[in-house]
């Protein structure tokens, strides 16, 4: 289980091209614009301007997803959170939005719609919550 990181991007919402490029960076690690551009153009059915990749990398940096380092004359972008951390942050935010509804009828309707596998997952989550509570009580 990946713990919730202390650092979070400033803006979680990403467009389709931003998401695609972020996944490329998670796969490759530290990248240049050329690395990303070449990866996208490896698909013969794709067209994308080099400057568009630069713009998206800059936007991902402004949103807090990437850091940019200059080495010599080249700029390298690297992720500030791992893919697993991003998934944990996303799940945490979705759970908080769900709980913010604060309407027992909505929560009950959700619980009624769960299948057996989902119920087992919720039971496992409940057990982890209980274990975390016991740990806090010991402190």
Located regions from the model:
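Short, Lys/Arg-enriched N-terminal segment that forms or immediately precedes the first helix
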Residues: 1-11, 90-93
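Pre-recognition alpha-helix immediately N-terminal to the DNA-recognition helix
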Residues: 19-23
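Short capping segments at the starts of secondary-structure elements
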Residues: 24-32
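Short acidic, hydrophobic short linear motifs in intrinsically disordered regions
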Residues: 31-40
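Short helix-coil junctions and helix-kink-helix linkers
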Residues: 39-48
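Glycine-centered, phosphate/nucleic-acid-interacting loop/turn motifs that mediate DNA/RNA or nucleotide
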Residues: 64
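Short, cationic-aromatic polyanion-contact patches
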Residues: 71-90
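Amphipathic alpha-helical dimerization/coiled-coil segments
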Residues: 89-134
